[in-house]
From Swiss-Prot:
GO terms for molecular function: mRNA binding; RNA binding; U1 snRNA binding. Transmembrane segments: none annotated. Residues 103-184 form the RRM domain. Residues 92-205 are annotated as: Required for interaction with U1 RNA. This is U1 small nuclear ribonucleoprotein 70 kDa. The RRM domain mediates interaction with U1 RNA. Its main location: nucleus. Residues 247-261, 289-298 have a biased composition (Basic residues).
Amino acid sequence: MTQFLPPNLLALFAPRDPVPYLPPLDKLPHEKHHNQPYCGIAPYIREFEDPRDAPPPTRAETREERMERKRREKIERRQQDVENELKIWDPHNDQNAQGDAFKTLFVARVNYDTTESKLRREFEVYGPIKRIHIVYNKGSEGSGKPRGYAFIEYEHERDMHSAYKHADGKKIDGRRVLVDVERGRTVKGWRPRRLGGGLGGTRRGGADVNIRHSGRDDTSRYDERDRERERDRRERSREREKEPRERRRSRSRERRRKSRSREKEERKRTREKSKDKDKEKDKDNKDRDRKRRSRSRERKRERDRDREKKEERVEAEVPEADDAPQDDAQIGDLGIDGIELKQEPEEKSRERDRERDRDREKGEKDRDKDRDRDRDRRRSHRDRDREKDRDRDRDRRRDRDRDRERDKDHKRERDRGDRSEKREERVPDNGMVMEQAEETSQDMYLDQESMQSGDGYLSTENGYMMEPPME
């Protein structure tokens, strides 16, 4: 390719001049000449220091020991600082603490972007606020970073108590605040968090000493959340494990599942039909009971009407008997043999009572008979449905057993066919005999399949027997 380039470009591809040869400065090891041979050091041993007079070896500090020492020194230094600050700490003489301590509310975990006006808007719903003080880093109020907590002084103590009860956990600017009373000036022996006090125990030491949730938090709520998270994680892992299994399943299993779902749907349909029938029967029974009740009510009303009419008639007859002369009445009261006879109205009333009792007993007997008849009818229907379900389950079980037996027969036939093929490969002379045997076995297998498919089954597909749809 380069031979076609012009000379000015070919000059660019020309090789450089070779590097001039210079002899090496150092000699090779075999070329070096040693003026003096190697010699021993025995004459110089007396010049060395005696090992017994040597100082003991200094032990160096390992990395782990150094880290442990620094940690221990830091803890001791911090404890000393806390003791010094505790001596000078006095919340009652704090110039920043103003107002009534029993009306002041402490708000922690406040968002750094939350302003005083936002806090006033959120906490003014519980009552009028006298003063709000957001705590900033020392010497940077108004321009520096806030510490994340504030003090709110209410005009009334009841408003502070209301805010203490209801404002805890309220979300302000995307963060849930923690609300508490001011404890520095109200609780004796109280120490702030920076001096080793406070409500929380989240910074005592390691994971075995610390508690996870501090202050007024309801730990049971967090425990429930952890439990729910663990449950969700377990379910997700279970679903992840299921997915590859489902992918590995073959097409025949899917067909089997479809047929099973079809069977379930058919069973469900039959159950729904039987339920609908039961509902209709119950409705008919209810209507019958209602009609019977209405008939009994009408009968009762008619009886009451008849009784009232008879009583009116009797009342009309009684005064006529009173107007008759006493002698006639006395003669009427005595019989032929001088026996006293009862008056006619009393007999009528007694007859009427007897008839009424008889009718009542008869109505109750009829009612009992109707109830018994309905109960027997319901029982017979229920028993019939149960027997049908039992027969249906028995048929299904029998069909399943038949399927299993048929699958076993198919497997045996396949195994026999494989064995005959192997035998044929081994013994080529008997090839014709084996072919005939195989053909006869296949014909028998086909006949058996046709017979079995005609016996309550439609067809075979991938070794799975399909049931005909239920009528």
